[in-house]
């Protein structure tokens, strides 16, 4: 439909001006502002506004929120982006509201689960939401959160890197959906931002 979507940004934006310009929320704000009505605040506050979409950037320690579960159950779309805080978490496996179980630690150039150079993107599946999009030849990912292997991982994967590891995953929750970008929303882990 032509109506503007109400999109909520939930993140920690209590930073200096310089830090704000580098924050994932800054990138999301600039990308979304032309086509969406943006709401910002804490999770409980934005849920009261009944947004169409809630976006969280590198948030960890999400409470097991009945209000968020109910919002998803009624058709909400929760989009999460990974980042250094999530990668550093020792309780990543227990994090609620993710489409897949994540391995602790993430993977980056020079890290413990390392690859030698940044990875490009694999072609998008023809039946997925990114079908028909052209992948820039210089698009690379330097770090990501890895999904634990599971029998349904392939069907939850919307986009993957050239090595076959998931870049974007999705799972239904009630009438809603949870989507995870396994890399950051800013340029810290990828040049896709």
Can you say where each PLM-predicted feature lies in the sequence?
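N-linked glycosylation sequons
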Residues: 1-193
């Amino acid at each position: 439909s032509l109506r503007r979507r109400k999109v909520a940004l939930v993140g920690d934006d209590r930073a200096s001006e310089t830090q704000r310009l580098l924050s994932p929320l800054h990138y999301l704000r600039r990308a979304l502002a032309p086509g969406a009505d943006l709401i910002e605040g804490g999770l409980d506050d934005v849920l009261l506004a009944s947004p169409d979409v809630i976006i969280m950037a590198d948030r960890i320690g999400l409470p097991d929120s009945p209000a968020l579960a109910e919002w998803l159950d009624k058709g909400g779309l929760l989009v999460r982006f990974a980042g250094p805080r999530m990668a550093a978490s020792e309780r990543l496996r227990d994090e609620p509201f993710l489409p897949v179980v994540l391995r602790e630690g993430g993977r980056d150039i020079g890290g413990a689960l390392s690859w030698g150079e940044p990875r490009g993107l694999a072609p998008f599946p023809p039946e997925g939401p990114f079908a028909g999009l052209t992948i820039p030849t210089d698009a690379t990912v330097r770090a990501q959160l890895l999904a634990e292997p599971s029998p349904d991982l392939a069907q939850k994967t919307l986009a993957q890197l050239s090595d076959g590891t998931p870049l974007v995953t999705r799972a239904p929750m009630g009438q809603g959906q949870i989507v995870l970008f396994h890399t950051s929303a800013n340029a810290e882990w990828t040049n896709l931002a």
